[in-house]
């Protein structure tokens, strides 16, 4: 067992709950037979105490004690997505 707290970075895909959001974590894995790299997505429920993040925001989250049946991650740093060129 490690003593380090796990931190991950992902994109907010849902913020319709009070003090909660769903964050999609993407990772790249290699197919065991064909060797092609495949993108896999994991959705995690995250505690957002101040409701400060919206859909599309890139956030940093860390693991914590279980807060509910599905929530055991909390928001560390809310980061905004990079500005798109030509979009206001």
Curated annotation (Swiss-Prot):
GO terms for biological process: translation. InterPro entries: NA-bd_OB-fold, Ribosomal_uS17, Ribosomal_uS17_bact/chlr, Ribosomal_uS17_CS. Gene3D superfamilies: Nucleic acid-binding proteins (2.40.50.140). GO terms for molecular function: rRNA binding; structural constituent of ribosome. The keyword RNA-binding applies. The keyword Transport does not apply. It comes from the Bacteria. Signal peptide: none annotated. Belongs to the universal ribosomal protein uS17 family. Part of the 30S ribosomal subunit. HAMAP family: Ribosomal_uS17_B. This is Small ribosomal subunit protein uS17. It comes from Yersinia pseudotuberculosis serotype O:1b (strain IP 31758).
